[in-house]
């Protein structure tokens, strides 16, 4: 007897509450997840058909039908009762109990087995590695009630050690597991950054049946390189220093920056580069140490990067490009302050400056006696001479300075000390 039902009715029936079925066999079938578009209630993968049997879960039994890859619209009746022996191979089935039907598909693993073989590295470059497997694990499928095929994920795993950048700095090793639904002739993965072995294991069905296939390559020595870098800049909190911007890598010279780099195992050559252009055509400094500190004393834009290469130079990598901007110099002097008048308010004479790399200031009274000398523009004069506040009146400063942009300053002027009468 042949069951001829149009697909629309089948799809509707598949959505009804079913009486359900269960499968048994000498080797336990593995139930797999199905896509809703398949219209199936269940799907199983079996290890052959030895002892393969379907049972209806309701006491009344069921009428049983079989269908093929064309779909369930042309199913053929194969028996009636509480249980039935299923056919060898991959087929779809219907368990019909009154107007309720349960649709399920059985895929025979032996039709597309995962065969044993050897695993080896076929080729590798700076970004990828190809593995050759002499065995096979082809695509597996099941079919829905309208004949459409759906891929079964065999969950074949490839395990190896990788390096990952750490937030604390440097690289850490961890085991990486990639999963494949089936195997092609060549397995392509990212080029490893550390010595490792590759282990292929699977598939999920052999694993469930406690006889997984497993093969491992010999040790692989990496040629690919990667790097991870960091830059930190000196943060000065001088109230009289003008910054060039809110960016921590922009500011007033001299600006001290510390550069730190970590490179992976295959790196044989490492270098920090400082250039005046983003394309690094004009490299003004090269430093082969992974960690170094540099003080930017000249005005302008500077670009910094780290590079690493393997022993033969076939693989090279570059870190992030950092931009340091040093603003043009500025220097101006106040002409009055009031030391001792109100503590913490206008009680120190300081220049206002930006990007001053050389500084010398001398302060005199009207008789030419030197009262104070300053060699750091962030420092100031507190209005004291030999520990005592000087009297109100006019005093004089002489300044010689040089900016990061090469500009020279020769300044002189008066300083008026103001103090309210008490």
Question: Where in this protein do the model-derived segments appear?
Answer:
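Conserved structural position at the C-terminal beta-strand
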Residues: 95-97, 202, 308, 399-401
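Hydrophobic beta-strand segments within extracellular beta-sandwich modules
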Residues: 93, 198, 303-304, 393, ...
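Short loop/turn motifs at secondary-structure boundaries
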Residues: 248, 253-260, 266, 297-299, ...
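Short beta-strand segments within Ig-like beta-sandwich modules, predominantly Fibronectin type-III
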Residues: 70-80, 173-183, 281-288, 373-377
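Bacterial Sec-dependent N-terminal signal peptides
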Residues: 1-25
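Acidic, Ser/Thr
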Residues: 54-59, 132-153, 249-255, 259-266, ...
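Short, solvent-exposed loop/linker segments at the N-terminal edge
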Residues: 32-49, 120-135, 139-144, 247-255, ...
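Short, compositionally biased serine/threonine- and acidic-rich segments at solvent-exposed termini, linkers
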Residues: 180-335, 354
